[in-house]
UniProtKB/Swiss-Prot annotation:
EC numbers, comma separated: 2.7.11.24
Similarity comment: family membership: Belongs to the protein kinase superfamily. CMGC Ser/Thr protein kinase family. MAP kinase subfamily.
Residues recorded with modification Phosphotyrosine: Y224
Post-translational modification (record): Dually phosphorylated on Thr-222 and Tyr-224, which activates the enzyme.
Pfam families in the record: Pkinase
Active-site residues annotated for this sequence: D210 (proton acceptor)
Species in which this protein is naturally found: Caenorhabditis elegans
Modified residue annotations for Phosphothreonine: T222
Binding site for ATP: L55, G56, E57, G58, A59, Y60, G61, V62, V63, K78
SUPFAM superfamilies assigned to the protein according to its UniProt record, in alphabetical order: Protein kinase-like (PK-like)
UniProt name for this protein: Mitogen-activated protein kinase pmk-2
Gene Ontology cellular-component annotations: cytoplasm; nucleus
Amino acid sequence: MGMSATMGDSASIPGVFFADFGPAPPEITPEGYHEVELNKTKWVLPQWYNSLKPLGEGAYGVVCTAEYEPTGDRVAIKKFFRPFQSTIHAKRTYRELKLLRTLQHDNVLEMIDVFTPDPDASSLNNVYFVSVLMGSDLQNIMKIQRLTDEQIQLLIYQVLRGLKYIHSAGIIHRDLKPSNIAVNERCEVKVFLSFSQLSFLILSFFKILDFGLARAQDAEMTGYVATRWYRAPEIMLNWMHYTQTVDVWSVGCILAELVSGRPLFPGDDHIDQLTKIMSVVGTPKEEFWSKIQSEEARNYIKNRSPIIRQDFVTLFPMASPYALELLEMMLILDPDRRISVSSALRHDYLREYSVPNDEPVAMDTVINSIVTIDPAEERATTLSDWRELIWNEIRLFQNSARRLSFVSCTDTEEEPMKI
């Protein structure tokens, strides 16, 4: 009775169709697959994925680790929660799959496999993504040890290198934080794309792309999307438009935490966050006020007593001169004056690791795949339509050379930098 009422209320949303979760799953495990129950969740996987262990759970799926039997490598597998609960859920699953199938970069966490145990598009109800399993994330590493300046340089360089690729594809990350930066013991970095937080910078393309909270550049952009401590102030100040430099601010916050050993702006709420930011970078000048769309935020800043920008040498006594200089350029309140990712990659602080001719950007085919809305997607209105689209994406990836083409981190001749 309660469920009927809920479904009835939900079904009143215009243009959104809810499902009965599709046909019942087959009682017999498909040939070539095996069934595992983990934390009360049923996993049906190809037989080459074994030794499952729980890893985490998010809003849209649950993640475990598994051993890929042919190589012995550990991988991470994400099972989507009810991807066909509604057309909104199905669309999100489709676009995440399409995006991850398209992006490919050393410093961006990639999808290496996707599968379903379901036999055809009409019965599609289960979707699994597979990625390389990195040893840890930056948040956990910072909890247990202080990194050397050399390690910090290498980490920040790789994060910026990944961002250069992401930005070139027309994407703003918006959720960059230590827990979204995967790191292995060789100090190799992969940026995790928190899909629902991405924003898409699509020039001359005015259609809103509904990737969760993601929007086209020329549509109004929503605030409050990133984790607060690493969130650029222009997002909190509710500007109509913001740019890729929101990610540079986040990198600056991460760099500051790496050199000082503590979060730079640990705000308790949005007002406290803004107060902490201005206590370090100072209150903005009057010409900056006109850029703030929110009247409440504008009045809040106007009515504050002027604060002088802190001396970063005093604030970060353990930081090298070049690290301080880069921090000064990243942590600027006005995004129009903030250093870009490309310029940051050329900064003297990262000189030892900088290889300008080995900083790939997205190819036109990648950009076109992200920008272009497939006519079939435009026509998709029912869950059956979305099942067909997702089924085709799964088959496209499974027929690609990239499937399970990952290389073990141990297959290298270079001496590792230990963390």
